[in-house]
């Protein structure tokens, strides 16, 4: 069986216009996949140079396959049908190592055609490293490496205004573009680089914050033989991902034209502020996950897919989203409804087995950040507690009992909550506290909730009633009126 290379699999080789820091599965199934589509259907004509930003030779370089690899996109399409689509990605020209090929790395700045810089160097990648110096070959941190590369470009082109870059980080931190820009400016200042360089950084370059959304499941280890047989070639860089994707870029509107998004309408939004889109994702996608987990698990289910194929639990989740989460969010209703429909479809993806217990990790913090804002906003707007989000809080407290049908299961949270719940449920079992006292103890933890939730009118009483129903009637019976 042949291995992918450009001799045996000839095709277009695009001029290098994109630098990408990061060789991992996510960028290959997200950025490079989109660039490949744009190259095929528009005149973007952009080749990608992947820069490996760390000192590691594992996995092997993409250059061993001349940059070629296959994506397999799997999930439910817009019609709810299970689909699996393979695509040979040709957008990556080569990979270089910033550690083994530092001179080659700096030479990228001399290419007049380079216009875009994408990155995913993990959440810790956009950070300050005190020891980084201008003459390091290379510096340790990604922002320092980028600063050195930008200065190389500034120097080579004598500060030409038309040689700046559009810098689009994909790291999962809030306002990643602004954070990266601040660090680049910090290094420029600490390294005493010319004031003209700082001016050029500000005037000729655009740092864009982003929100990225796609579940990338990566190399399909258990299915490789079967997939390669159907493809007809060996591919050491096979990359699998879900059907859904969303790319929100906070940047100038001319960016849509530069990326040729006016010619191929991908699911990419160029917006003035990513904040409402971040809030939408956290509230609907992450919030629904967090509400679902304790309810579904205590109802006897083990995966998200099982839960969404269960009529009762699915109805609970959908009504929580549409009746209690969406009404308090600050985006057009039709956009929120469309996103919510996509979320439900993603939860049903038969190709992804999401274990409820793995999503349950740090559930107390997740509830505070993902659900509590909508619960409190709903109570403030409507004057009544949103019943499903309130029930989800009761279910969460029941979940931290650590027992389902007489059997234990592992709980994963910070040590404070694990110890506190063990103490409270032991006291309840000994009848030394009432159920209401247990609920009050949880809701009054101001250090965690950043407020005393027993002060929210009716909340402690309703959580106690819901918790009593879960414990005495079972989850199925307790949740039924809310489905």
From Swiss-Prot:
Enzyme class name: oxidoreductase
UniProt keyword list: NAD, Oxidoreductase
UniProt cross-references to HAMAP family, sorted A to Z: Altron_oxidoreduct
Signal peptide (from-to): none
EC id: 1.1.1.58
NCBIfam families membership: PRK03643.1
Pathway the protein contributes to: Carbohydrate metabolism; pentose and glucuronate interconversion
An annotated GO cellular component: cytosol
UniProt: NAD(+) binding residues: 18-29
Annotated TM spans: none
Catalyses which reaction(s): D-altronate + NAD(+) = keto-D-tagaturonate + NADH + H(+)
GO molecular function ontology, one term from the record: mannitol-1-phosphate 5-dehydrogenase activity
Protein name: Altronate oxidoreductase
Organism taxonomic ancestry: Bacteria, Pseudomonadati, Pseudomonadota, Gammaproteobacteria, Enterobacterales
Pfam families: Mannitol_dh, Mannitol_dh_C
GO BP, sorted A to Z: D-galacturonate catabolic process; mannitol catabolic process
Top-rank taxon, per record: Bacteria
Family: Belongs to the mannitol dehydrogenase family. UxaB subfamily.
InterPro entries noted in UniProt: 6-PGluconate_DH-like_C_sf, 6PGD_dom2, Altronate_OxRdtase, Mannitol_DH_C, Mannitol_DH_N, NAD(P)-bd_dom_sf
